[in-house]
Amino acid sequence: MTATPKPLVLIILDGFGHSESHEGNAILAAKMPVMDRLYKTMPNGLISGSGMDVGLPDGQMGNSEVGHMNLGAGRVVYQDFTRVTKAIRDGEFFENPTICAAVDKAVSAGKAVHIMGLLSDGGVHSHQDHLVAMAELAVRRGADKIYLHAFLDGRDTPPRSAKKSLELMDETFARLGKGRIATIIGRYFAMDRDNRWDRVSTAYNLIVDSSAEFHAATGVAGLEAAYARDENDEFVKATRIGEPANVEDGDAVVFMNFRADRARELTRVFVEDDFKDFERARQPKVNYVMLTQYAASIPAPSAFAAGSLKNVLGEYLADNGKTQLRIAETEKYAHVTFFFSGGREEPFPGEERILIPSPKVATYDLQPEMSAPEVTDKIVDAIEHQRYDVIIVNYANGDMVGHSGIMEAAIKAVEYLDVCVGRITDALEKVGGEALITADHGNVEQMTDDATGQAHTAHTSEPVPFVYVGKRQLKVREGGVLADVAPTMLQLLGMEKPQEMTGHSILVEE
């Protein structure tokens, strides 16, 4: 194995995409002398961090979880959204043994099928097309009583956009000749992830016992009444639609969210016999199915089992005796550890982790530097003492300040990043180390919505930069994706990539 400079640093600038448009582009509006110099003097190009290139449906913007999973895996990791969509298209979904078993059991006992989930086209936690497919499956399996418990979005979709989704489900049930919307409630209640059990209990009691502050003849009528009360989709209060459709013993309950974090709490209320976070009036004995595995500790089957990733970058470095540091502030710590390691919580042998607390402010536009200076102090110290073969760092600023929609703060955020990158590259030059600079997805390069003129707070589908910083004569090939970053790092370290990594190095000899 050839001797390699020490260390190799992967700098992930979260939410730092590339756009030629100056409109609302915090990166082009900022003074970034370090990045400007690197773009002029170092091999660089653009790589893709969205859509099929990261295992998402075509055109779907990337996100931090997906981005880090692809960066660390060295292969395109097909996301749950894509797996479910593909299964529906192929017809496999309608034969899914876990869902079919639960539905068949309910049907043979003359019981109901309850479908619940986030009803929107946001594609972040769920997709309405999946709920349509579930209704079709229930009808195909002979169910007569099919009830939809719709959680309304307004967070990954515009604040008042649920009407078309409710109409889609009404049309679906009319076409199928069976089924109806039974309840509507905002995701604020049904999809909490911070142990706010008062909210979750409101959703649970609505679904199980039709216990509701409001009721309406149709889903759309219930929504319009909520708007009249000045409630946006996310905050729509518990509303029963039509006659009560309570959950009874022997019913099937299928939760159609594919993302786990906001589906765990409500699921636990349904399935845990020793649940103690609030007093349940009733716990019906149901055939419960999670669309994906929300947590290994939850005693319920999942329709799509979690896949495990072998020989991700962290594991392969450890197996080859290399040391590594993972470092980020709180907001992105899970991404640079758990997600970058392919969904593994524990560190690999020779892996150290540093968590820098994120600042305690209401929103990060109030402190756009976040904890980047403290993160950088630790990295510079680690480089100077040459403690690790590889350092992997995430800077949260571009994404977290980008989500605020406030342009001035976003400009300050990326200017702080430029200073931090300068400190790291200066330290590396002194010890003969190297760096790769990239991002997981875009955000801060688009702070205004061209269509509406309003603040743009979401991620983008723009490509992200890729920069090599070091002494080697290399150039960046075109067509790279996030999955190519780990193989590139192994090339720089003089290591063969494992066969599980299907990505290819982005750097080629000049």
Swiss-Prot record:
One GO biological process term: glycolytic process
Keywords: Glycolysis, Isomerase, Manganese, Metal-binding
Consequences of knocking out this gene: Cannot use, as a sole carbon and/or energy source, a wide variety of hexoses and intermediates of hexose catabolism.
Any single GO CC term annotated in Swiss-Prot or TrEMBL for this entry: cytosol
Gene Ontology terms for molecular function: manganese ion binding; phosphoglycerate mutase activity
UniProt signal peptide: none
Binding site for Mn(2+) 2: 14, 64, 440-441
Residues annotated for substrate binding in this entry: 125, 155-156, 187, 193, 259-262, 332
Residue numbers binding Mn(2+) 1: 399, 403, 459
List of catalytic residues: 64 (phosphoserine intermediate)
Record has Zinc-finger as a keyword: no
Catalytic reaction annotation: (2R)-2-phosphoglycerate = (2R)-3-phosphoglycerate
Cofactor note: Binds 2 manganese ions per subunit.
A Pfam family the protein falls into: Metalloenzyme
Pathway the protein acts in: Carbohydrate degradation; glycolysis; pyruvate from D-glyceraldehyde 3-phosphate: step 3/5
Statement: the UniProt record of this protein carries the keyword Manganese: yes
Subunit structure: Monomer.
Purpose: Catalyzes the interconversion of 2-phosphoglycerate and 3-phosphoglycerate. Essential for the growth and pathogenicity on the host plant.
HAMAP family, per database record: GpmI
UniProt record similarity statement: Belongs to the BPG-independent phosphoglycerate mutase family.
PANTHER family with a match to the protein in the record: 2,3-BISPHOSPHOGLYCERATE-INDEPENDENT PHOSPHOGLYCERATE MUTASE (PTHR31637:SF0)
Protein name (Swiss-Prot/TrEMBL): 2,3-bisphosphoglycerate-independent phosphoglycerate mutase
Protein species of origin: Pseudomonas syringae pv. tomato (strain ATCC BAA-871 / DC3000)
Biological classification of the source: Bacteria, Pseudomonadati, Pseudomonadota, Gammaproteobacteria, Pseudomonadales
